[in-house]
Amino acid sequence: VILIRIDYNDRMITKPQKEALVAAAKEVLQNEFALKNNSNYSAAVLTKAGNIYAAVSYFSDTYTLTVHGEQAALIHAAAHGEGEILAIAVAASKEDKKSGEFINPCHLCKQLLYESSRRSGIETLIILSNNLGETKEVLFGEMVSYPWPE
């Protein structure tokens, strides 16, 4: 599979778009359906069409049916007919995490992001945010060295 490596410095995704993406992920964070009040997760995706779709995690009592924020954001975009994802912002509010620590997508979400990128041919930019208002940008290929299936 060949993914299109977008030059993100070439203003394919502008700074205001990145800021809006992170803001959207953080804005919906308060709406998460959590079992406990000590952890909240959300995400927002930016599509090739320029639209932003945000979503929160939806925790199930059994945990096996839990939908993660990243999964829900991808589904939200797909429900609107948009599967070409340029970037995803991940936000979290977790009391047991150190101040300033970034939350990475779990491996299930990384797999789903990989499959989304594989279908569209676009390598997704992942924007991690922390509770200090800082962000860290990582291309999907830098986060996952050996995706499956190749």
Could you say what each language-model-derived stretch is?
Residues 13-31, 83-150:
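C-terminal binding/interaction regions
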Residues 34-37:
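Short loop/turn motifs at secondary-structure junctions and domain boundaries
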Residues 51-52, 135:
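Hydrophobic "anchor" residues
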Residues 60-79:
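A short mixed-secondary-structure module that forms the rim of ligand-binding clefts
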